[in-house]
Amino acid sequence: FNVLGSPKQHVVDNTIKELNTHAEVFDMMGLPTTPYAKINIHVGGTYGGDFAGTAKRWCANFHRLSETAQARITVENDDKASMWSTRYLYDYIHKDTLVPIVHDVHHHKFCTGGLTDKEAMSLASSTWFDIKPVIHYSQDRSVEHNDPKIRAQAHSDSYWTPVDTHGLDVDVMLECKHKEIGLFKMRQLLA
């Protein structure tokens, strides 16, 4: 939906308008102009595996955003092997823009970029500077329901394994279908 690296100008123009509008709403709400009040997006496609070209467009268009939008943007790793791993986000996006990376533990299982989860989470955490890093955590819905017809990337209803932050001081956003029930389950698992 919001694709700063798109080769289509109308998609980029709509994305810039959308992200700037989100930042304006955050401003009206009095939220901090930092990644603490993040606008989290995926980089989007690679357009034939052209990571360098896509990243060049993404970074150039990122700099067209309002200052308050730029200050809040974070990027998240993808759940497909041919897409944006935490490593690629670091190498192609963060190094140019200093945009923080939200490491999604579940997505990492499908797009590792050659890193372990611990290495990827540590790398992503290093991009947050003085703001507490954020990670996303969900589990495999097909395992939860013992149904191989469900896509492995689909988020679970709840949790059966506690989140492993690898000793890092991070905020964990729980991404499960049963929302608060999942939170209570996670609290039990971590107790």
Regions found by a protein language model. Give the residues of each.
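Conserved, mostly hydrophobic/aromatic
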Residues: I73, D104, V172
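Short loop/turn segments at strand-loop or loop-helix junctions that form parts
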Residues: F1-L4, I41-G45, H106, S138-D140, ...
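Active-site-adjacent pocket scaffolds in enzyme catalytic domains
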Residues: M83, H103, C111-T112
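Active-site acidic/histidine proton-transfer and metal-coordination neighborhood
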Residues: N2-P100
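Histidine-acidic metal/acid-base catalytic patches
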Residues: V99, K109-A191
